[in-house]
């Protein structure tokens, strides 16, 4: 799966999981904390991403996921 396809799926999962308002446009630079996500929300998001992409993030990758782009990079590295 190429970068743009992964990005599109990540944005979809983020929108669904964090219930992002329709008027908010997500980019690779969007930080989850700026969307009001707390640690529970991030855990829920990571679980949803792992399910969507059928993978498991290692602890090191989890510590680095703070933005949409970070999530895309972690998925690319895990595939």
Predicted regions and their residues:
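Phosphopantetheinylated carrier protein domains
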Residues: 43-64
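Catalytic nucleophile serine of serine hydrolases
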Residues: 39
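Thiotemplate assembly-line natural product biosynthesis machinery
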Residues: 1-23, 78
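Generic alpha-helical secondary-structure signal
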Residues: 9, 45-48, 74
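Phosphopantetheine carrier-protein modules
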Residues: 17-34, 54-61
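Short, structural beta-strand-to-alpha-helix junction motif
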Residues: 31, 67-69
